[in-house]
Amino acid sequence: MTNKTTKIQATGKYVRLSTAKTRRVLNQIKGKKYQEAILILEFMTYKPCKIIKKILESAGNNALNLKYEKQNLIIKQAFANDGPKLKRFQPRAQGRAFRIQKPTCHITINLSIN
């Protein structure tokens, strides 16, 4: 007898957000039900919430494609990894330039069936 497990996952890559600030929001929704997490993200005022909500909805739609119902889903894993940093220069006085690093991150959300 084989145990068939399907992976319900959505990933957002090269998102122009700080990894630390994104993790702060992801920790709030880990282990929650799908509908509850959507509600939490809708009313939080942090910048990453809008993008995380989009990725979570994408994962929910992936589950619908596999014939699962959204009300039975739970967020099994939600994590953010560092992406490449965009390097920019800020002109300063007397011909100098300061280097600015704009962070990116990769957000992954895994769902499981309740």
Swiss-Prot record:
GO terms for cellular component: chloroplast; large ribosomal subunit. Its main location: plastid. One of its GO terms (molecular function) is rRNA binding. SUPFAM superfamilies: Ribosomal protein L22. The keyword Protein biosynthesis does not apply. It is found in: Plastid, Chloroplast. Part of the 50S ribosomal subunit. PANTHER family: CHLOROPLAST 50S RIBOSOMAL PROTEIN L22-RELATED (PTHR13501), LARGE RIBOSOMAL SUBUNIT PROTEIN UL22M (PTHR13501:SF8). NCBIfam families: rplV_bact. This is Large ribosomal subunit protein uL22c.
